[in-house]
């Protein structure tokens, strides 16, 4: 029986490309806030969320968690050379404004802020009202 062939694999090193201008996509839901920083073509450079930075359960939906997530994503993006971002905000959550402020305070220059929240043209039925 022939011995299995071992292919000599050299370690793949991912080349870190420099992206001076990017886009920050902030998706803020009622349960969490997700920040993705991409290059102009849409390829993700860095991302972070409320759960990613260590919050669990209902704490993920707080503005503080959104700010921490935005700061974390900004730091990772700045390692790739991102200096300026255009911000696209989606969703009704509480962490929208805090995330934008945290991107600025982390050292990223915010060029424009655009709200891209989808509007339903009588699409799906909304969730029922909460009775507490």
Swiss-Prot record:
Key words of the record: Ribonucleoprotein, Ribosomal protein, RNA-binding, rRNA-binding
Biased composition (Basic residues): 7-16
Cellular-component GO terms for this entry: ribonucleoprotein complex; ribosome
Gene Ontology biological-process entries: translation
Region feature (Disordered): 1-24
PROSITE patterns linked to this entry: RIBOSOMAL_S11
Coiled-coil regions listed in the entry: none
GO terms of molecular function: rRNA binding; structural constituent of ribosome
Origin superkingdom: Bacteria
SUPFAM superfamilies hit by this protein: Translational machinery components
Cross-referenced Pfam families: Ribosomal_S11
Protein family: Belongs to the universal ribosomal protein uS11 family.
Assembly and oligomerization: Part of the 30S ribosomal subunit. Interacts with proteins S7 and S18. Binds to IF-3.
NCBIfam families, alphabetized: PRK05309.1, uS11_bact
Free-text function comment from the UniProt entry: Located on the platform of the 30S subunit, it bridges several disparate RNA helices of the 16S rRNA. Forms part of the Shine-Dalgarno cleft in the 70S ribosome.
Protein name (record): Small ribosomal subunit protein uS11
Organism from which the protein derives: Bifidobacterium longum (strain NCC 2705)
Lineage: Bacteria, Bacillati, Actinomycetota, Actinomycetes, Bifidobacteriales
